Amino acid sequence: MEPSRRRMTRDMLLLIVTMAWLVTGDEGGIKQEERLFNLGKLEMFVDKLPHIPTLHGYHFVNGFLKPKSLHIGMFFKKWKFHRDLPATPVFAYGTSKRSATVPGPTIEAVYGVDTYVTWRNHLPLHHILPWDPTISPAIPKHGGIPTVVHLHGGIHEPTSDGNADSWFTAGFKETGSKWTKKTTHYVNKQQPGNMWYHDHAAGLTRVNLLAGLLGSYILRHSSVESPLRLPTGREFDRPLVIFDRSFRKDGSIYMNATGNNPTIHPQWQPEYFGDAIIVNGKAWPRLTVRRRKYRFRITNASNARFFRFFFSNGLDFIVVGSDSAYLAKPVSTKSVLLAPSEIVDVLVDFSKSTSKTAILANNAPYPYPSGDPVTEENSKVMKFIINYKSEVDTSIIPKKLIEYPPAHVSTSTRTRYIAMFEYVSSIDEPTHLYINGLPYNAPVTETPKIGTSEVWEVINLTEDNHPLHIHLGLFKVLEQTALVKSEEFIECMTKRNDAVKCEISKYARGNKTAVTVHERGWKNVFKMMPGHVTKILVRFSYIHSNESYSFDATQEPGYVYHCHILDHEDNMMMRPFAMVL
């Protein structure tokens, strides 16, 4: 594939800047490059895969399950990502500074039992990473680092959703315009599945996650899940939280401090990519496994990197869940493409291996889909060392999983067009990204009715693949259709910003790309192909019962939908929506 004009321009700009450093002796630039840690010098697979600590969002009182209140802090500390890398300054979640980890503790909740979490900000006055005030509306008057926690995939009241403007600083000294309370309430009445929690402060999400503010959340429902006889227990059912980072020689996280349009945004870059692949807080770890089935709940917690996972020895993934919901039946596949924020729930049967080891590998270009090929460092994820002894395995791969009530387009109440725009400067470098031609802080334009379904036709007018995440609602992907005469359509949309007036039906009639089999279940985020219209059916009720929510979803501050490439989300590629009765 020919490189895009944008990439060519970016490469040329990088060359010019590099030459300027050499000619002018720009010590700051040269020193910055010299301080980068050469990751090729790190030996892979020397650290064991860590067990992430677990916090239970429930407890037993006289033999009965009861709600529990958790207090989880955000702390500044040092973290060892690799045996031979100096300790790294990070922000970490935990019940204390000593116990705080990257990723944060896995919260386990039980269906029907409320969990309450008081998130406490213990972070210092100044950030450990460069951040761009031209894109961040979350700027406190008296210093400190704004934070707010979003439970990704959670179905709960707006005041507990982690709205980007509901931020707070250390000790709740300052709060955002939509902050309401110190304690979040997770009602846990949705379908069982996998979620993750992470920071969501306006304009700071990318740097706060890069610093380490993320963790897993699992909702269990024993009467529904136990009959499936999937692998269980701490050894055989494990979250894998995966992200990419680069480092300086002193161990600190490297993030480019110069924007691609520095006269507009001094620091903002359209995507962050690191070369070390981190799993559960360790770079390229190893895990010794037995010859039996394991369950891995894999979260892509990267800022912008897509992963296309596969095993070096050809082992299959048996996909049982996608994002926060089970599939109707298991799907076997040789590879899995995971966008930032997506979760895939898989079984791997190591008894099928013909080799003693297997590398979990990656071959997704970055940016996806037409960026650079992977390198030696970012093409390796982790290593499995497979025990030679066979053993009895009582877990199974069931023929069926969980069948939810069907979703029919005929039941939808309306169709909405959601257009993704990217705007560039005179040097053809991105300056900002809008949805429907509007910034995040423009008034609400989408007002779905509680208990209904809507068809959203997502029109990607950019050259990037954008993972679209919808808070509260879940959806099914119906079809993906290429645009014909796309430049003509983009020109009209840029002028009129109206898909109907631009006669979308004339252009959305190109080749159709089938939805991958294991992504045909209920999703809360999906990859929107560039130059395509992706039709989804969004459900605004519980999918397991089709019942209305158990809370008032019409409250302020409402919900949002956005691109989950964090650098895009922070630079306006997010829109609010409000539920109505």
From Swiss-Prot:
Signal sequence interval, chain numbering: 1-25
Q: Where in the cell is it found?
A: Endoplasmic reticulum membrane
Domain Plastocyanin-like, residue spans: 274-361
The annotated topology with respect to the bilayer is: Peripheral membrane protein
- One example GO MF annotation: copper ion binding
**Residues annotated as binding Cu cation 1:** 150, 469
Q: Which family does it belong to?
A: Belongs to the multicopper oxidase family.
Q: What is its main location?
A: endoplasmic reticulum
Q: What does the record note as the disruption phenotype of the gene behind this chain?
A: No visible phenotype under normal growth conditions, but mutant plants have reduced inhibition of primary root growth in low inorganic phosphate conditions.
Q: What is this protein called?
A: Multicopper oxidase LPR2
Glycan attachment points: 256, 300, 460, 511, 546
Q: Which UniProt keywords apply?
A: Copper, Endoplasmic reticulum, Glycoprotein, Membrane, Metal-binding, Oxidoreductase, Signal
Q: Name one GO biological process term.
A: cellular response to phosphate starvation
Cofactor notes: Binds 4 Cu cations per monomer. The Cu cations are bound as 3 distinct Cu centers known as type 1 or blue, type 2 or normal, and type 3 or coupled binuclear.
Name a GO CC annotation attached to this entry: Golgi apparatus
Species per Swiss-Prot/TrEMBL record: Arabidopsis thaliana (Mouse-ear cress)
Binding of Cu cation 3, residues:
200, 471, 562
Cofactor(s) of this protein = Cu cation
Its EC number is: 1.-.-.-
User: What exactly does this protein do?
Assistant: Multicopper oxidase that may be involved in copper homeostasis and oxidative stress response, and that is necessary for root growth inhibition by low phosphate conditions. Functions together with LPR1 and PDR2 in a common pathway that adjusts root meristem activity to phosphate availability.
Q: Which residues bind Cu cation 2?
A: 152, 198, 564
Return the InterPro entries for the record: Cu-oxidase_2nd, Cu-oxidase_C, Cupredoxin, LPR1/LPR2
Designated gene of the protein: LPR2
Chain sites annotated for binding Cu cation 4: 466, 563, 568, 573
